Amino acid sequence: MATEGMILTNHDHQIRVGVLTVSDSCFRNLAEDRSGINLKDLVQDPSLLGGTISAYKIVPDEIEEIKETLIDWCDEKELNLILTTGGTGFAPRDVTPEKFPTFPFCGLQKGATKEVIEREAPGMALAMLMGSLNVTPLGMLSRPVCGIRGKTLIINLPGSKKGSQECFQFILPALPHAIDLLRDAIVKVKEVHDELEDLPSPPPPLSPPPTTSPHKQTEDKGVQCEEEEEEKKDSGVASTEDSSSSHITAAALAAKIPDSIISRGVQVLPRDTASLSTTPSESPRAQATSRLSTASCPTPKQIRRPDESKGVASRVGSLKVQSRCSSKENILRASHSAVDITKVARRHRMSPFPLTSMDKAFITVLEMTPVLGTEIINYRDGMGRVLAQDVYAKDNLPPFPASVKDGYAVRAADGPGDRFIIGESQAGEQPTQTVMPGQVMRVTTGAPIPCGADAVVQVEDTELIRESDDGTEELEVRILVQARPGQDIRPIGHDIKRGECVLAKGTHMGPSEIGLLATVGVTEVEVNKFPVVAVMSTGNELLNPEDDLLPGKIRDSNRSTLLATIQEHGYPTINLGIVGDNPDDLLNALNEGISRADVIITSGGVSMGEKDYLKQVLDIDLHAQIHFGRVFMKPGLPTTFATLDIDGVRKIIFALPGNPVSAVVTCNLFVVPALRKMQGILDPRPTIIKARLSCDVKLDPRPEYHRCILTWHHQEPLPWAQSTGNQMSSRLMSMRSANGLLMLPPKTEQYVELHKGEVVDVMVIGRL
């Protein structure tokens, strides 16, 4: 049997995706599932698809297990998109798309995907094959199948990490619109179709070369950059693309597809492909990206953030699209820092940044942080979102007089006595008979009240007098109590009246609010956008968690912790990786974060070390406004906060200390409240409660945020706060199980410690 599927949720994304890895070796734990894990990252990247991983599973190359999983994810979990990776080659056990015949001359048999799908999507399979063939001739050995089952799109991707990523990018521009079509998202589909109608038809070439084949013409479409097109218009001469530009990637297709289609599907140019050279050391993918560009027009570097509304300018700051191409010179200039690292002896011995009080720093962060714009989402994706509009009921609830209890609909004026039963009214049905004097009708909870009745008597206040011979019907019942008019009946509009405001602008939605939207039939709502957060760690000493330790190296924990902290609050994240202590690398990484995210979080490189260049890069290269560079607090003294305003769009930058505990504490103190404000929460401040100390605590000259575990004792109104032990800022163990931060005052001559049982303020940072 297959390994147990891992179900993940992220309520903030609209496209629910399942990733299915088909591999005997991965299933038996003989190999790592690099392809599946990479696809999950690509799906969740807000600058690409911006989807939610709702299901993930590894199965062996067994056709029945593949089919069982696909059917379950389509019919039961109702996913929007399923990506399979593996089993698409020529090997005997490659049965994901279709199975080879067991005996000669018996014809091609259906495999897992072909047996499951109801309609094929051959265009997507063709796009993957064409793109793969431009990368390697071995692409012809792939047998992908794409198709539809119900409202779910199923895509077969290759088994390798590289191949699956490339094929995912080839089809990415069309995925959001395809899913909108399957979900019958009428508004979004109409917007796209309207934009397609508005697109001008390309003029025919003035004198096409006689050797130009239809295939070549297909490759040429959409490749020219806008600047070159403008030059051609001015000169009145039309030309075709050079034959070397034959690899049509997602980015190239995006140049001719409406933004509403590609808002979640633009290929992002990796940092290491900015150069146009195609040396043998480059990967085939990098070479293919370079071949897309002409000598004067490199691959577009701009991206659009997910769900950007039609006509709204890209929020990419200085990289805002002014033209679809930048020169090689501009790209190289942007990649070099102006920070001088040669004069080590002249570096600062004392920080040039004044100490800022915690209160002032916190107020500054909230004052400088903007509230993001709005977007329209499906109500199912509203968990954790903030409404940007009032929501009104369009119908009464209940829309008919409804019974509150199981019993009998009666005429109150009849009083107690024996009554004939004329039928029944059940929930979901409208009774057609009228209750006359001396009659009653049996009703269930929630059922409509029949005409003529004006009260309900619960079944407990009745006695059955007569039934049918076979016991299947009640014929006569005795009413034992006097009913009053309106008794146990919910009148029309009793719960919600038509036109009533059921949810106000600024409401932070939870499960009840989602249910209320469903109740009133409001399936699309306007909400504030979620901020996209990019996270990176800095330091030459850092290794990825999966790497073996080397002399002088440590594993990077900050990035994982910060990403998890942000994701715990539901915000989409971008992993920028580890960046070395080099101004050029820092500048490139920051530029990438600025182009893809609303908020950039870094850890390390902000203290007084000779390799701490981050503040200089922010100041000298990016011309960011550094609002504070030191905070009078423990831990987190070198915490830095900066903003960057480009073309009317503000980017927020938090440069956090490199010590693990300092990074987590300052993230909770500054970053999380800022993100809450950006998404429109009216009071973004953290929750602070009172608690009693479980032990004596010595005070520090600085205000301290001491990690603790909050627990409640029986019949005591206040929780007790237990210290997590050694509070050294490098000791991440002090954060283990911590759900609160003791907000300790600075030491004075009168107070050098707080004693057990004293009441202190505690900031809640975890589940209680």
UniProtKB/Swiss-Prot annotation:
Q: Where is the lipid attached (S-palmitoyl cysteine)?
A: 225, 297
Identify the EC number(s): 2.7.7.75, 2.10.1.1
Q: Where is this region: MPT adenylyltransferase?
A: 326-768
Its annotated compartments are:
Postsynaptic cell membrane; Cell membrane; Cytoplasm, Cytosol; Cytoplasm, Cytoskeleton
Where are the residues of the annotated region MPT Mo-transferase?
14-166
Sites where Phosphothreonine occurs are at: 211, 278-279
Q: How is it modified after translation?
A: Phosphorylated. Palmitoylated. Palmitoylation is stimulated by GABA type A receptors activity. Palmitoylation by ZDHHC12 regulates clustering at synapses.
The activity regulation comment is:
Inhibited by copper and tungsten.
Q: Which Pfam families match?
A: MoCF_biosynth, MoeA_C, MoeA_N
Tissue expression from the record? Expressed in tissues including spinal cord, brain, liver, kidney and lung.
- In-chain residues carrying the UniProt-annotated modification Phosphoserine: 201, 207, 213, 275, 281, 283, 337
Protein family (similarity comment):
In the N-terminal section; belongs to the MoaB/Mog family.
Q: Quaternary arrangement and interactors, per the entry?
A: Homotrimer, homodimer and homooligomer. Interacts with SRGAP2 (via SH3 domain). Interacts with GLRB. Interacts with GABARAP. Interacts with GABRA3. GABRA3 and GLRB occupy overlapping binding sites. Interacts with ARHGAP32; IQSEC3, INSYN1 and INSYN2A.
Q: What name appears for this protein in its UniProt entry?
A: Gephyrin
Q: Which organism is it from?
A: Rattus norvegicus (Rat)
